[in-house]
Curated annotation (Swiss-Prot):
Family statement drawn from the similarity comment of this UniProt entry: Belongs to the L-rhamnose transporter (TC 2.A.7.6) family.
Pfam family, one: RhaT
Catalytic activity from the UniProt record: L-rhamnopyranose(in) + H(+)(in) = L-rhamnopyranose(out) + H(+)(out)
GO cellular component: plasma membrane
Annotated protein name in UniProt: L-rhamnose-proton symporter
Segments forming a coiled coil: none
GO MF annotation: an example: rhamnose transmembrane transporter activity
NCBIfam families: PRK13499.1-1, PRK13499.1-3, RhaT
Keywords: Cell inner membrane, Cell membrane, Membrane, Sugar transport, Symport, Transmembrane, Transmembrane helix, Transport
Transmembrane segments: 4-24, 38-58, 68-88, 101-121, 137-157, 175-195, 214-234, 259-279, 290-310, 321-341
Known function: Uptake of L-rhamnose across the cytoplasmic membrane with the concomitant transport of protons into the cell (symport system).
Taxonomic lineage of the native organism: Bacteria, Pseudomonadati, Pseudomonadota, Gammaproteobacteria, Enterobacterales
Length: 344
């Protein structure tokens, strides 16, 4: 496996680790509605950071974006909005199916859709079937799915042992939302594919290859922000027991603490895609769609490991932990299969 591909896989692992940890600061926020907390974190992650980093990277911020016509920017924005819808459905999926089943189905679907639809859209699916490297990366995708399934099973065993149930279990509604979540969440993969002209333009301006994808986040995450913030603001305006005014009527130290914690969560959320861009830059162009598979499978891997570190599995017993460990090993094997396939 080449050093470039090894580093690409490593950066995807770092990004996924940040994704697995980003909600920890949000859990420390006190006496705020979820909508206010999510909005503050989202403003940091979807608006402030993409704009600020792009302004630092680009020699002429407005000239860069002004060179693209609507036919280039609109698909990138709409795929970002599609991914934003997936974000909202993710929370509802957990509500009706529980964490383990919800994550397993949603992540499994988005892993397949986001990874395999991109070469189909680009007319390159034959690379997966008719080349040795393509067949090997395809094998890696299916091994990763097995790993996700094993980790999901471990989570179910843990929930059963600890008596954890879905907030409002509804299999029919939960499965529908999980499928929608999986499909719509793949919008980020499609957006990155649609943003290739933006990446090429950034490279032409002398932006380091590791950073060329970051300016496109202004548009991609702008679409996601529109959906997520719109959802939160509508709820804050219409739901009777929710109020921004009440959330900001707390003591000043608590407000400052909540803002800082939400901002930290937003920063960690953004870092997942900051390092995703680094990993994406190291993946061979003909296999760039594999970035999504690596990110999502590593997200499940890191989520399990973070849970162990935070002692969330302490009272689950040996069997769930053993099954979790097996699933993590399978995901690591899948990443290595994909890496070897990309060097073939």
């Amino acid at each position: 496996m080449s050093n470039a591909i090894t580093m690409g896989i490593f950066w995807h692992l770092i990004g996924a680790a940040s994704a697995a940890c980003f909600y920890a600061p949000f859990k420390q926020v006190k006496q705020w509605s979820w909508e206010t907390m999510w909005s503050v974190g989202g403003i940091v992650s979807w608006l402030i950071l993409p704009w600020a980093i792009s302004a630092l990277l680009l020699p002429d911020f407005w000239a860069y974006y002004g060179q693209f016509n609507l036919s280039t920017l609109l698909p990138v924005f709409l795929f970002g909005a599609m991914w934003g819808i997936g974000n909202i459905n993710y929370g509802l999926t957990m509500r009706y199916l529980g964490m383990s089943m919800g994550i397993g189905i949603a992540i499994g679907i988005t892993l397949i859709v986001g990874t395999l639809m991109t070469p189909i859209i680009n007319g390159n699916f034959d690379v997966l079937i008719h080349t040795e490297g393509g067949r090997m990366t395809l094998l890696g995708v299916f091994v990763a799915l097995i790993g996700v399934g094993i980790v999901t099973r471990a989570g179910q065993l843990k929930e059963r042992k600890m008596g954890i149930k879905a907030e409002e279990f509804n299999l029919k509604k939960g499965l529908l939302l999980a499928v929608m979540c999986g499909i719509f969440s793949a919008g980020m993969s499609f957006a990155m594919n649609a943003a290739k002209p933006m990446h090429e333009a950034a490279a032409a301006l002398g932006v380091d290859p590791l950073y060329v994808a970051l300016p496109s986040y202004v548009v991609i995450m702008g679409g996601g922000a529109l959906v997520n913030l719109g959802f939160c603001f509508i709820r804050l305006a219409k739901v009777q027991n929710l109020s921004i005014k009440a959330d900001f009527s707390l003591s000043r130290p608590l407000i400052i603490s909540n803002i800082l914690l939400s901002a930290l969560g937003g920063l960690m959320w953004y870092l997942q895609f900051f390092f995703y861009a680094w990993g994406h830059a190291r993946i061979p162009a003909q296999y760039d769609y594999m970035s999504w598979m690596l990110h999502m499978s590593f997200y499940v891997l890191c989520g399990g490991l973070v849970g162990l570190v935070l002692k969330e599995w302490k009272n689950a017993g040996r069997r769930p932990v053993a099954v979790l460990s097996l699933g993590c090993v399978v995901i690591i094997i899948a990443a290595n299969i994909v890496g070897l396939g990309m060097t073939s």
